[in-house]
Amino acid sequence: MFKIERKIVEFVERNVNILFMLAITGLAIVVRYAGRDFVSGDMTWFLLGWFQKIADNGGIHSLKDQVGDYNILYQTIVAIFTYIGDKSIYYYKILSIFFDFCMAISAAIFACELSKKEKNDKVFFVTFAAVIMLPTVILNSAYWGQCDSIYTTFIILTLLYLYREKYHRAFLVLG
């Protein structure tokens, strides 16, 4: 083995977990990118119309009236998106995809807590990979533009804080 090859092998061996995480993250982004233009029935019949109604009624000013059936925080985020432009399908999906990663990281942290091992890098990386690559997670955010990962992230964080006996934080993230 040449000197350069040895250095490459040593680098890979030292950083295998980080390289694994980067590879999974890259794959997760590519798979989600493939769904960027898919428009589900729910997106057509509800989400796009709600976005347009919020935009037509003045963005943030439209929040005085209920638009759709999502909570006010989600509607506020949608209202902010109306000021950016009219690519609403992408805004819905980007928000949900961002929370896919938050959910995967939260689940991985919680799995590490439950494993009670001192060094649990593998638990973290495997949990992250499993969650971020679940077909239901990918379909919900990247293809359908649904917000399931947003709510699930906060539920996982609630469970994590309850496990740590941080009840005030659990109450805050669940609310």
Task: Kindly label every feature range from the protein language model.
Residues S106-I109, I150-R169:
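Specific aromatic-rich, kink-prone transmembrane helix
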Residues M1-V31, C112-K117, D121-V126:
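Start-transfer (signal-anchor) and selected internal transmembrane alpha helices
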Residues F11-F46, I97-D100, M133-L139:
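Transmembrane signal-anchor helices characteristic of membrane glycosylation enzymes that use polyprenol
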Residues F124-T136, L174-G175:
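Short helix- or helix-capping micro-motifs
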Residues C147, R169-G175:
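Transmembrane helices and adjacent periplasmic/lumenal helix-loop junctions
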Residues I94-K117:
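Transmembrane-helix motifs of polytopic, lipid-linked glycan transferases
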Residues A142-I150:
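Short acidic/glycine- and proline-prone juxtamembrane loop motifs at membrane-interface regions
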Residues R36-W50, D65-I77:
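Extracytoplasmic catalytic/substrate-binding loops of multi-pass membrane glycan-assembly enzymes
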